[in-house]
């Protein structure tokens, strides 16, 4: 037998291409391809018919597959809804949208907090009462009003040394502290001694007694 005989017998088993693709779709499926199975209802005869109908509608003009999504094709063939394909993607996208904005908001909040802290440190003012009051700091000079000075001069004219009780009374009267009254009288006595230096080299007994009484706390 020649090779031509084998070729003729091979092609005679299949119909012509014009008869196979006359409608522009796939040939009709055999019964074994879509056999009904009671355990798999999605692949029954009804689903096979719908799948064949959907496949016939894919190529009405020769290139209509681009206008239909893959989800629609599989949904029509296997009896699934298009929304079932997004059941895993939608929660994942929601989680991403919920996590990423939160991270950016936290980063922005931390940056604003740092900026506010730096601005607060740069604008921090030190008031006089906030400075240290140690012995290394030079103490400012105490100033007295004219009324306070006049009353202290009157008291010094009568008594150059004050008892503690009298110092407390004058401090309450002139709105001063006991320490301020004591310092003023000490300075006034030093001034008075310089003015009256020619009067005598030492102090009298009365002055020493008053000084001892004044130093009692």
From Swiss-Prot:
UniProt keyword annotation of Aminoacyl-tRNA synthetase present: no
User: Which intervals of this chain are the motif Antp-type hexapeptide?
Assistant: 126-131
Q: Which UniProt keywords apply?
A: Developmental protein, DNA-binding, Homeobox, Nucleus, Transcription, Transcription regulation
UniProt keyword Cell cycle, yes or no: no
Tell me the compartments it is located in.
Nucleus
Source organism, top-level taxon? Eukaryota
A GO CC term attached to the entry: nucleus
Q: From its record, what is one biological process in GO terms?
A: myeloid cell differentiation
Which CDD domains did the record assign?
Answer: homeodomain (cd00086)
To which protein family does this belong? Belongs to the Antp homeobox family.
Assembly, in brief, is: Forms a DNA-binding heterodimer with transcription factor PBX1.
Q: What does this protein do?
A: Sequence-specific transcription factor which is part of a developmental regulatory system that provides cells with specific positional identities on the anterior-posterior axis.
Q: What is this protein called?
A: Homeobox protein Hox-B7
